[in-house]
Each structure stands twice: as structure tokens, then as C-alpha cells.
Amino acid sequence: MASFQRKGLQARILSTEEEEKLKRDQALVSAFKQQKLEKEAQKNWDLFYKRNSTNFFKDRHWTTREFEELRSCREYEGQKLTLLEAGCGVGNCLFPLLEEDLNLFAYACDFSPRAVDYVKQHPLYNAERCKVFQCDLTRDDLLDHVPPESVDAVTLIFVLSAVHPEKMRLVLLNVYKVLKPGRSVLFRDYGLNDHAMLRFKAGSKLGENFYVRQDGTRSYFFTDEFLAQLFVDAGYEEVVNEYVFRETVNKKEGLCVPRVFLQSKFRKPPKDPAPTSDSASL
């Protein structure tokens, strides 16, 4: 088994067979069921963590390799970094970061109360270095837990795809309030034409690039254009916005699994410097 990764600015081109499959699967889930899924979104994620405990996702040790902002507290002794992990799950990204960098303080929140409990039960959890809380990012005000403009970086890693597209902007506006001017949201999520998107069976489609899994959790598959517009409309500036292509090849089985992710950085604009007394008199 081997994995190969590359980056690019264009979405993955589908094979003829893949295109035909997507064309066949155009029927949408009924409006009634879609409303039920939205209403029960938190319950479905809580049940997901009840079934899978902390075993479903692997720890994400790649984040500091891909995002230099998460390494910034290593450059100078005593330099601190304050992070918000929006949608922390059971801590697969959070705890590798806390373990690697003793100068990191993290706020972490999740939609699922059960996931938050798992984070608090983790042997590396330390309330002096991490504040974790339950939060619906589309509705609950982050300022109830995090001071305004106090965070050096926000991670949104495989989080926004689980939110209804009509509510994604609310998440971005919410984290905007706690992010320092000139600092960035670090984003990675499912990209258009990812292998997972093509595996959905007929009857799973909720809307354009939006699907429901059998367990009731939902997933959106992003294009770079859609994501850029979403962030820019919420007041951010685009820094990096590119596709990541990973192919997992099993030569023995003759399998090649094409994964597509979107990896991006969007910056909160820096504040204009206050005018000096000299410039004010001109």
C-alpha cells in the first residue's frame, strides 16, 4: 500500500464512468427528510461518537507540515501561540499539537457534547493549556468562551463540510470575531470529485455537492470557487486555496483510490495603523 500526494488549482477530472454515475444520481432526498436531518444534526454526530468512541479518525500529525502558522511558537523561546480548533472532534488534531508545542494554548469546541467529554477524558488534557467547550458554530456566540480578537490561528479541518451550505457563512462570521487582525483560518476539507463523493448510493443527494451518509451525518464537497466566495463574503482575504490530490495504491489488489481535498488559508485583514499626530495635522 502506497500513497502519493500532489497539489493543483484544478478539480480532478472524472472518468466517463464516474461522470455517468453522477448524472444518474440526480434525485434529491425529500424536503421533509432534509428538515429532519437538519433538526437532528447534533444527535446524529453524538451517536456517531457513541458508536466509534475515539477510534474512528487517526491522529493528524501532518498539520504542522502543511500550515507553518502552527509552527510559529517554535521559532523563538517563550513565544506563545493561541489557537482555536473549531470542530475539534475527539482531539485528533488538538493533542498532537499540544504534545509537540508546550508554548501552545488552545481553545477547542465541538457540536457534539460526547466528543467534548472524550477530549476532557484524554490523558493529555490539561485545563491550563486547553479550554474545551460545546458549541454550535452556526448559532452559539464564540465570544461567550473566547475573548475578541485574541486568537493567532483558527483551524477548520474537516468541519465545514458537515454544516448545511446555507449556514456555512455563519460559522465564518463567528470565528472572525475571535481571530486577531492579520491572522488566518487554516482550512482543509473534502474537495469536489473526491472518492467518497462517488461512493454515495442513489438516494443520498441533498443538493449540489451535498450528501447524507447512512448514519445521518452529512458531507459537502467543496470547489475552490465556492469556498473562496464564502470566505470573501464573510470579510476574509484569500491567501492560498488549492486542491490536494492523494492516491492510495494497492498493487496487490489492483486498487487506486483517488482522494481530493481542498486546503486553504484565508486571512482576516490587518487593521490600518492609527494615524500619527503628524499625519493627522496634514
Curated annotation (Swiss-Prot):
Main location: cytoplasm
Listed InterPro entries: Methyltransf_12, METTL2/6/8-like, SAM-dependent_MTases_sf
Pfam families hit by this protein: Methyltransf_12
Binding site for S-adenosyl-L-methionine: W45, Y49, G87, D110, D136, L137, I157
GO cellular component assignments: cytoplasm; nucleus
Function noted in UniProt: S-adenosyl-L-methionine-dependent methyltransferase that mediates N(3)-methylcytidine modification of residue 32 of the tRNA anticodon loop of tRNA(Ser), including tRNA(Ser)(UGA) and tRNA(Ser)(GCU). Interaction with SARS1/SerRS is required for N(3)-methylcytidine methylation.
Documented EC number(s): 2.1.1.-
Organism: Mus musculus (Mouse)
Keywords: Cytoplasm, Methyltransferase, Nucleus, S-adenosyl-L-methionine, Transferase, tRNA processing
Protein name: tRNA N(3)-cytidine methyltransferase METTL6
Assembly with partners or alone: Monomer. Interacts with SARS1/SerRS; interaction is mediated via tRNA(Ser) and is required for N(3)-methylcytidine methylation.
Gene from which the chain derives: Mettl6
Domain of life: Eukaryota
Catalysis: reaction(s): cytidine(32) in tRNA(Ser) + S-adenosyl-L-methionine = N(3)-methylcytidine(32) in tRNA(Ser) + S-adenosyl-L-homocysteine + H(+)
Disruption phenotype: Mice were born with normal Mendelian ratio without developmental defects. However, male show a significant reduction in body weight over time due to reduced energy expenditure. Cells show reduced N(3)-methylcytidine modification in tRNA fractions.
GO MF entry, a single one: enzyme binding
Any one biological process term the GO annotation gives: tRNA methylation
Taxonomy of the source species: Eukaryota, Metazoa, Chordata, Craniata, Vertebrata
Protein localization: Cytoplasm; Nucleus
UniProt family annotation: Belongs to the methyltransferase superfamily. METL family.
